[in-house]
Amino acid sequence: MLEQKKVTLEIAGIPMPSFVQLMLKQSINEHHYFEITLDIQAIEAYGVEIPEASKDWVGKKVIMDFGGTVFVGVATMVGLHRSGGTHGNIKVTGYSSTFLLESDHTCASWCNKSLSDIVKELTDKAGVQALVNPETKSKLEYECQYEETNFRFIQRLARQYQEWLYYDGQNLVFGKPQAGSTTKLTYGEDLSVLDVCSQTLARPIKGSSYHSVNDQTYNGQSPDTAAGQNTLGQAAFDSSLALFTAPAVQRAEPRITNKGELDAYFQRRQQSDSAASSFITGESDCRILTVGSIIDVHTAIHTGIGIHVKNSIGTYIITEITHVAGMGDSYQNYFTALPSSIPTLPCPDVPLPVAHTQQAVVVSNEDPKKLGRVQVKMNWQTGPMQTSWIRVLTPDAGTSDKVPTNRGFVFIPEKGDQVMVAFRYDDPNRPFVLGSLFHGKSGTGGGSSNKTKSLTTRSGCTLSLIHI
């Protein structure tokens, strides 16, 4: 059994000599949340009616040390609580440092940047320490943050690309980290409660994705084979697929450029959805545990007087843990853990944004692939932000047996033209030009009684149809 050290607390750079109670809830994919209760007489002058000395703690750093495992957060609320005629307590609540990424809902975009580039840019601006090493290494043609906080956008990226996401107490981890040290826990010693469970989470899925540049529709499906599961998880995976035999038909959430990317997406999607097929929950007094900790769980079987045989039931990674510490030296935690060999974690439970049609200005129509695409800049896109090369909707477009290309209406907007942009699947990452718009400086209408219909080129050549 590990030697247990006292939990220490610091708020706004001030060490707290004691506390009434401390609760810290940590979970993958989310901010961590804490509540601290302090005796009012240890902080405030006798008889205060409102917080005085502690009021300046709002927005300040909170550091908890569990004897080697450190948690860094920020206080977001301080209050004076009274009940039952007592003099009261000071309550401090707040979140992990990832809360600094909770900007207001905003829009931004990136062209030809990697997931690593995007996440590092956001965390650096917010002053959040991060360990960024996603499995998805390639540069993304276009990625859009749409009316989301910075943290919600990072959650959505983790969902779209099935990347690991959690806060380890000091760093935001994006991408599967290197395996750390393992902590041994034994039921009857460090563990007072242990539940070993399995559940039916696996489902078959299939779908398609269209790539317009080469006019290819790619089809793919989940491999329906468990990855990284222990024997209990493997059995649950197989039982689940036996229950749910009809594949769900879905579209790929990220933009796909080839068949290999689509197959990899459905594989990782199924791995993420079924990651918790086998799990354990427990109660422990081991204080060094946190989200991301690897534990080697043992049980002790009584085989005779004073004789116990210890057996390992496997190694697990903690995905959720709640710490509760009180006066004196009391401490307990409650955790959930998944097999440590799983390749992906359950993805964040966040909705995909729904993009609405919006106005933009054409910044280029010199399509390098000569496909009639344009680049546009929407009103919220500032600085170097703009779309990648996007298609233009036209009344008629295609080919024929005698016309291999450009059959139909070919009217590509000019640079500087105002256009309306829509989105396939309402996905902000899939914009296209819906049509062009006249404005107060570019349009004069159809003349008296709207009699004139005309077609005018950039050089001034005009075809007019005048109603008589």
Whereabouts are the PLM-identified features?
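Amphipathic alpha-helical and helix-coil boundary elements used as assembly
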Residues: 1-466
